[in-house]
Each structure stands twice: as C-alpha cells, then as structure tokens.
Amino acid sequence: MSVISFKIKVPASSANIGPGFDVLGIGLQLYLTITVTIDPSIDTSSDPHHALLSYEGDGKVPFESNENLITQTALYVMRCNGIKDFPRGTHIHVNNPIPLGRGLGSSASAIVAGVYLGNEIGNLKLDKYRLLDYCLMIERHPDNIAAAMLGGFIGSYLNELSSEDSQLTTVPLDYILPKVKNGELITPQDKIVSQQPPNNIGQYVEYKWNKKIKCLTIIPNFELSTDLSRSVLPKNYQLPDIVYNLQRIAILTTALTQDPPNHKVIYQSMKDKLHQPYRFGLIPGLNTVLQKITPESYPGLCGICLSGAGPTILCLATDGFEKIANDVIEIFKQEGIECDSKLLDLAYDGATVEYGS
C-alpha cells in the first residue's frame, strides 16, 4: 500500500476580546501543526489505537493516543462514525509553539486539530458547521473554538437546543474523552459517548478587521487553568455591569473595522466589568497594566485586555509596539514575573488541511 501524508494547521486564538466575554475571539498567526503519515510498513502495535506520536514545542504532553488531547478528540469523531482505531502505521508529529495554559487557545487549537484529524482519517467529508458541532461537544465555549477553526475576527454563541440534545451536550467530558490512568480505562464502558453530536450546537458570524491593527501579546511565564480562572467569577452580575459591556461590544465590533482606526473609541470600548476585575488576584500586575497602558501615554495603542482567561495580555496597536511591550513586561517584572512578547497578525484562513504530493 502507498504512504499517505497530510498536514493540519490550526491558529492560536485570543478570546473574551474586551467586553466580549464568551463571545468575541480572534485567530492569530501562531500555528499548531500536525503532520500525519500513514505507512503500513511501520509497526504501531505499541499504541492501543495504532497511532505513534512525537512532539516538539511548548510544555509536555502525553504521547499515548488515548491520553493526548488531539488524538483523543480524533478518536471521539471516529468512534461516532463507527471507526475504532487509526489505520495501522499512523505516525503523528505535533509541532506546537502555542504556550500552554496562557490564554492563547492552546486547548482549542488541539481540539480543532483533533476534529480535523478524525474527519480526514475517516474520510467523513464533514462541513464546517458539522466540524464545529464536534468541537463544541468537547470545548463548550465557542469563542476560542470558532476563532481557531475559522480564523479572523469572530462572534459566536450557543444555540438553544431541545432538552434531549441539551442532555447530550452537557454530559461529563470524561464520557466524550474517556479517562485513562496508567494505561487503564477509568470511564465506565457503558458511559462512553459514541452518538453523533446534535446539529447546530453553535452559531458564528465573521466580522471585518482593520489590518493596520496588530496584535501584541505579552505572555507571562506561568500557567493559569481556565477552570481556576472561571472559579473566581460571580454566579450573578449587577445589571449596570452587564449594560456596561453590552454598550461597548456594540461599538467595538464596528470600531475595529474603521479606517483610520479611532484609538480612543476602541480603547474605551475594550473595557470590561464581567471578568477582568475578578481575575486581578490571579494575575499580579494585571490591574496596574490596565490602568497605566493607555493611548494617552502610548501613542499607537488602540486597546488592551486580558487574552482569554489569562494570564496573557492582548494589546491592539498600530504603532509603538516595542515600548508598549517593554513597559508591560517591566510591570510584571516588578511582581517577580518574567514575560515573553509576540507581535502577531490575524490568521484569516483558520484551520487548513494540506496533502503531500
């Protein structure tokens, strides 16, 4: 049999843009890449599902196909379509420059890559809406997922589903991605979901973006889990705070398209009262950064916010990138936190699949 090879690229993403908590996301030109080779002459029997993994990039990840997020996700898609294992001789090399647990959508990129991988392995020919359904069964916040899958500047929401469909979309994640410990399956076999996801779990819209606006990310050198970051949020909000964000999100989605960009309007419309103030205690220096980094003191700055659940800071700017980055890094340094910075453009193509010749 001939050797098959293909490559899947998925951009990083930044969610919760300004007032757009759980709504707005952008794809960024920092790519998770997986290179898949299927060569029947290679012995892959050492893996329970015949997929050998290799990895280079940020952090450490599991190499067993039933524990790695990318291959777990692919196995879920395949299982829902009657496919148990990868083809014998499957090798998957993961190259991941996206920092783990920093608010740049590393898990969303992995999930999107896994869904695309399952689609290719099974030759399922799923369209983007159906691919999104599979993604949202695992990552139930569409802002990162839609941005990673589609690229660009995206708004999204979850549709209201029937009670039956809602039950399926809210099952414990261990039923979707079975939990394994020391090679042993922990999730009860009869609980593992093999039913295809409901149709149209989420909806998205693609906004325009002024390409003069660049994305400067300042990335602190510590991880912050989304679960921990969400745990500090209130269960109920005050109406004035909700209205505050609604007013700004209505302006921001248009302001980011206008040319020339109105820096002051974008800056004011990127303010938030729904999540950032509650996360100050988890990210030393965040409050100072938001107070000190303004268009008045940094010409070229359009807006600033927490990227996703943090701790990364997202600065939208047209100029003055080096000074902005250096001063944000210095604020964190005073808190004993080292940072890296990356200047990125939007990734407009989203996730892609390319076959070798």
Swiss-Prot record:
Domain of life: Eukaryota
BP terms from Gene Ontology: homoserine metabolic process; threonine biosynthetic process
EC number assigned by the record: 2.7.1.39
Signal peptide: none
Keyword field contains Lipoprotein: no
Oligomeric and partner information: Homodimer.
NCBIfam families: thrB
General function of this protein: Commits homoserine to the threonine biosynthesis pathway by catalyzing its O-phosphorylation.
Protein name per its UniProtKB record: Homoserine kinase
Species name: Candida albicans (strain SC5314 / ATCC MYA-2876)
The encoding gene: THR1
